[in-house]
């Protein structure tokens, strides 16, 4: 995998500039064949901008700046060329077409970063950190991704694998050179070190849920009957009109997703269809989807209308959020009240709101911060797992190590518990990419955009 590839690296749409990137063997030759310098200098200077034009059959395609970066000190550790074009859709597309017509191949999704991994510039956890940085919705998520790109996950896993390797060395030495294993072998040092590794693995695994929240946001679902103010709440939190607000019940028929940064905490908010009994097929599907979102939510905001009497549909909503992490809003307090709070919401903490008048919104925001800042993992914590793939691998390693330590304590023959010990060591290598198969690699890099 060293042929010349090319792709658009800048975002699609109107912009000041566009970027087309190439890497691989022969990319300088491809550039030479389509680039006409403004002066007569023959060679590109490493890491220096060169002004000129991209041409196709001597016809100018675009006025550009070109930067040629010579291997190995590049993103991919191969020769890299970046062409800075005028912004917009057409200019970058036409420049890319010229490159493809003159020897470059269109890059696959994530192929630039995949080459950086295969060429040893980054490990797999760092490659995954790059896509997390690109997708980060808050400063905190970005900071965690940056630490992982700098190698925080790699350092943690390498330290644990090194300890497991020391244990394996001790065990294998005993297998090969101890004549009477049962009488002479002392497993105590190996057992103690194994317990230390196990404890650290469990702490990493336990960090994954809060790490996921930092990375993906608090999965928050707004529920309630039609016209209680769900879409108005979304707009109030966003501080813009994203959702349609009308007096017509059932206006929201599908789930609207938006991200909000709340004092460094990211909320992924799902504005759902109003929950009620309905004969409308489309609305009914929306209601069913609303209910299904509840089970996967980290937080549920249930809204009730203080101007209406409590009814069976309200009771159904209360039942849905029972034993869930939730906040109850009693909205429309600016209207005459029909809702008996003491009778129907006894023992439930309620925030009184008039979303239309922006009353109670700050109280809601403060409540969310209070709920999720309690023991919240800070972005400068290196001992944090944000990737679900990493968590699953760590959990598999925990099972293997627990099995090995159990057999060790039970006096099982040494060559038996060595198998699970080695398995734990190999499993952890999947995080950094040292023991991962091609299918996993292809899946990870397919999540990247083309051009990264």
UniProtKB/Swiss-Prot annotation:
Required cofactor names: K(+)
MF annotations from Gene Ontology: GTP binding; GTPase activity; metal ion binding
Broad class of enzyme this protein falls into: hydrolase
Residues given in the record as GTP binding sites: 227-232, 246-252, 271-274
The keyword GTP-binding is assigned to this record: yes
Cofactor note text: Binds 1 potassium ion per subunit.
Residues where Mg(2+) binds: 231, 252
Residues holding (6S)-5-formyl-5,6,7,8-tetrahydrofolate: 21, 82, 121, 452
Primary location recorded for the protein, binned into one broad class: cytoplasm
GO BP: any one term: tRNA methylation
Positions of the TrmE-type G domain: 217-373
E.C. no: 3.6.-.-
Pfam families: MMR_HSR1, MnmE_helical, TrmE_N
Record Gene3D superfamilies: P-loop containing nucleotide triphosphate hydrolases, Probable tRNA modification gtpase trme, domain 1, tRNA modification GTPase MnmE domain 2
One cellular component term from this protein's GO annotations in UniProt: cytosol
Record note on quaternary structure: Homodimer. Heterotetramer of two MnmE and two MnmG subunits.
Classification via NCBIfam families: mnmE_trmE_thdF (TIGR00450), PRK05291.1-3 (NF003661), small_GTP (TIGR00231)
Name this protein carries in UniProt: tRNA modification GTPase MnmE
Organism: Finegoldia magna (strain ATCC 29328 / DSM 20472 / WAL 2508) (Peptostreptococcus magnus)
């Amino acid at each position: 995998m060293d042929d010349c590839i090319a792709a658009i690296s800048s975002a699609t749409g109107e912009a000041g500039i566009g970027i087309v990137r190439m890497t691989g063997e022969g990319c300088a030759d491809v550039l030479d064949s389509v680039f006409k310098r403004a002066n007569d200098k023959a060679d590109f200077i490493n890491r220096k901008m060169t002004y000129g034009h991209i041409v196709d059959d001597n016809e100018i395609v675009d006025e550009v700046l070109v930067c040629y970066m010579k291997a190995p000190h590049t993103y991919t550790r191969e020769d890299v060329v970046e062409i800075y074009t005028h912004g917009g859709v057409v200019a970058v597309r036409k420049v890319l077409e010229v490159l493809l017509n003159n020897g470059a191949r269109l890059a696959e999704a994530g192929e630039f970063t995949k080459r950086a991994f295969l060429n040893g510039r980054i490990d797999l956890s760092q490659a995954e950190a790059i896509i997390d940085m690109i997708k980060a919705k808050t400063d905190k998520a970005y900071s965690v991704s940056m630490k992982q790109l700098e190698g925080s996950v790699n350092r943690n896993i390498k330290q644990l694998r090194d300890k497991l390797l020391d244990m394996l060395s001790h065990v294998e030495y005993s297998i090969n050179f101890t004549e009477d294993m049962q009488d002479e072998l002392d497993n105590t040092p190996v057992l103690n070190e194994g317990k230390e590794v196990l404890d650290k693995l469990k702490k990493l695994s336990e960090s994954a849920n809060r790490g996921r929240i930092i990375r993906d946001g608090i999965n928050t679902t707004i529920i309630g009957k039609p016209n209680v103010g769900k879409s108005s709440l979304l707009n109030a939190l966003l501080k813009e009109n994203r959702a349609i607000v009308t007096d017509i019940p059932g206006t929201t028929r599908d789930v609207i997703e938006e991200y909000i940064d709340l004092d460094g905490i990211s909320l992924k908010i799902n504005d759902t269809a109003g929950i009620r009994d309905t004969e409308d097929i489309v609305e009914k599907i929306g209601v069913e989807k609303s209910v299904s979102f509840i089970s996967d939510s980290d937080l549920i905001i249930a809204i009730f209308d203080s101007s209406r009497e409590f009814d069976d549909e309200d009771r159904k909503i209360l039942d849905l959020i029972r034993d869930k992490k939730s906040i109850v809003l009693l909205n429309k307090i600016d209207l005459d009240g029909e809702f008996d709070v003491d009778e129907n919401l006894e023992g439930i903490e309620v925030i009184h709101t008039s979303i239309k008048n922006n009353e109670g919104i700050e109280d809601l925001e403060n409540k969310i911060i209070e709920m999720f800042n309690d023991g919240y993992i800070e972005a400068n914590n290196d001992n944090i797992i944000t990737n679900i793939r990493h968590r699953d691998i760590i959990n598999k390693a925990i099972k293997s190590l627990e099995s090995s330590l159990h057999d060790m304590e039970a006096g099982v023959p040494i060559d038996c518990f060595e198998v699970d010990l080695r398995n734990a060591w190999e499993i952890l290598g999947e995080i950094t990419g040292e023991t991962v198969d091609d299918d996993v690699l292809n899946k990870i890099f397919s999540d990247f955009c083309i051009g990264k």
